[in-house]
Amino acid sequence: MAAGKFASYHRNVQMNHPLVSSMDLLGSKSALGERRSDAFKNVCIHGTLPRKKKERVPIRSSDMFCHMGTLPHTKSHRLPNPLMQDIKEDYPFQERRTGIFNMREHYLDPAMEYVKFSKDRYIMDGGTPDKLKKELEEELKLNSEDLRSHAWYHGRIPRQVSESLVKRDGDFLIRDSLSSPGNLVLTCQWKNLSQHFKINKVVIRLNEAYCRIQYQLEHESFDSIPALVRFYVGNRKAVSQQSGAIIFQPINRTVPLRCIEEKYGTSPVRRLELGIMEVKSEPTKRLSLNFGQGISQEQSLVRGNLLRNKEKSGSQPACLDNMREKRRPLKAHQSESYLPLGSRQPCLSQGMDMKTSPKPHVFRTGSEPTLSPTEIRRFNHEVHPVEALRGSDSQLCPRPPPKPTKAPSIKQSQSPLVWQSSEANYCEFHPTPPEDCAWSDSHSSHNSYIEDQRTDEIETLSFSNSELSFPALDDSISQCSATDFCGNVEDDEFIRPVYETVSSFCPNDFQSVLLTAENKPLETSLLRRAKELFTNNDPRTIAKHILRMDCKVARILDVTPEVERMMGVSSGLELIILPYGHQLRLDLMERHSTMAIGIAVDILGCTGNLEERVATLHKIIQLAVEVKTLGDYFAFSAIMKALDMPQITRLEQTWTMLRHQYTQTAITYEKQLKPFSKYLHEGEALDAQEDVTVPLVMPLVTLLERQSVLFEGMDFWENNDRGCEILFNHLQTARQVAHNATVYKKNAQRILEGFKPDELMSEIFKTEFQMRLLWGSKGALLKQSERYHKFGQILTALSRKLEPPS
């Protein structure tokens, strides 16, 4: 409008008053630009500064410099031309008056070459390249544990920008996550694809007053991000097993982090806007009519907050982020385009009549068409009625929701994405349930997205370690039964795992071929019969019998579907790391200690000549070799525990004769078995898990059941200089044990395939039989601590009887 009215004026004519408004400049099309487009093809719309050329050019018409506004100046400001709406004034009017105009009174020197000068670039660069270089060097000189000291850290850059930086396989950089503030993302290129890996933060609370943060991608954890990068780059290890991506070439930043933050925005609102952009678009720049404010004012606008809470005007809807309610943080999987603002509205069903909800006291201004009435909008009801929000054309954040499609074939019901917010999903649980514990009809709809989400939530309610709490939901659970709560689940009905409180070992109810109804501790006939069975079978057969019984006790093999439902998992190796696996952990400790005591009794019970005792020791060492070969580290640790008891190690005559008569066995024990046992108990056998059938779980079980009294020697990390490292290794082993439970089961099935166990041999390796043999029918019912203490005294007496102390 304005451009058409004054199209006949020469563009350098000065006026005393502005003739157009900022809205006219931004909203209307200039007729002058249409008519004289050919005349301005070579015109640069940026500000210019003179620079001396080597060669002189012939003087041309003053039209060549018409874009500079070189007519004699007056006291009034010049009129901004519509063609110059993207111009950012580099210098105030007075500076140009005293500077540029003094060179020539009426025209510029044609010997000068005018260089493009960008205002944005000037602000981003902070002045000169030398200044930027110095600032970057200062950042890189910081502590090596500081992320800013590493050039591969790029700060808050958008996802699309990071993908454009990594161009070859192995290229990588670290950036801040815009969708999940506070987290870091590893961006890399692998197999010609840009991949992003979120770096997880793990808070390790050592005690109530001290905790530390570790960073991990999959399994390995590190105290800092630089340590994580050094590990994956130095070892050329895949950052993800699924993708196989390997990083080795860092992409370094060339400017300070300050410039990156200024370019892509430092405020949370600006980061949100960058996060939801699918295609990069240059935002419309706002032309300021006040040229006298200069760079200082423009610079403060860039570095300051671009949002002004009041007196905004424009054609877009007002920003809702100025309301009092705090914005909720986004989850990593949620879309920023559908961020819920303000209070939640109850979910609507298809069967209900659409009722008009009371409108909030928020006034919408601008010419943007209103959204479809079928789309549910949530605003804050706590805003003051008198506070009207007015938009700004160029500086509103975040962007308004997308306009509804005009295609009649696409219905709103087919786009449930507006409800993918976690707050929207959980709004189903907040209304108070009726007395009959059934969900209200107004909160459910047939074949609805919300109902599917509610079903998914119900399936994951129990045994959740989340720190979030839903009071209304907790009240509902306490009032309703599990059957009513899961009434809508047809296929996979959730069954609450059973917290076992009774041991699976029942010595007095044990049906035995060798034992009578009541027996005394260490009956001679039973000891003799058990020793015959042990002597008449080869170590390989004995090892398979032990492996079979260990797999049954640990619930690796022969687990019925009923037991699986009771446990809530498919293997006992998973159950032992869960809170309600307390009883299984106690049973495993019982079997381990009972087996070790039984082996010690087998050696110390040889009250005859020395040769018999040495032969028994030789057979037990061979058995340790076999169970190690079969991968039964549980039994292996029990045997090694027995051989390492002080009552056994003090038998100097027995060990000396073993070295003479069975030299190879003694060497195997000293050079192979003992180092491997130490290796296992220090948690260093993480890589030796391929052929394992029953992993070593005793250190983990001991740690989780510290309140229980165990046989001495299991809490070895308490008096070790590397105690913390050993403890951490066992916690890492626990992860692998639970993760590889299926592998252990397959290994055990493969080894025991076609094996036909002997009934009597199987009986003597059952825990109930060993308890009755060692403590009798009455003593087996005593407390564990009391039984172990008394039997320790018995073993000491037997050892001193065989070889009296000197």
Curated annotation (Swiss-Prot):
Q: Which PROSITE patterns match?
A: RASGEF_CAT, SH2
Q: Where in the numbering of this chain does the Ras-GEF domain appear?
A: 538-805
- What GO molecular function terms would the record report? guanyl-nucleotide exchange factor activity; phosphotyrosine residue binding
Keywords assigned: Guanine-nucleotide releasing factor, SH2 domain
Q: Specify the superkingdom.
A: Eukaryota
The UniProt entry's coiled-coil ranges are: none
User: What is one Pfam family matched by this protein?
Assistant: SH2
Region labeled Disordered — which residues? 308-343, 390-412
Record GO biological process: endothelin receptor signaling pathway; epidermal growth factor receptor signaling pathway; insulin receptor signaling pathway; positive regulation of MAPK cascade; small GTPase-mediated signal transduction
Q: Which residues form the SH2 domain?
A: 152-251
Cross-referenced InterPro entries: Ras_GEF_dom_sf, RASGEF_cat_dom, RASGEF_cat_dom_sf, SH2, SH2-Ras-GEF_adapter, SH2_dom_sf, SH2_SHEP1/BCAR3/NSP1
Q: What does this protein do?
A: May act as an adapter protein.
The name under which this protein is listed is: Breast cancer anti-estrogen resistance protein 3 homolog
Q: Which gene encodes it?
A: bcar3
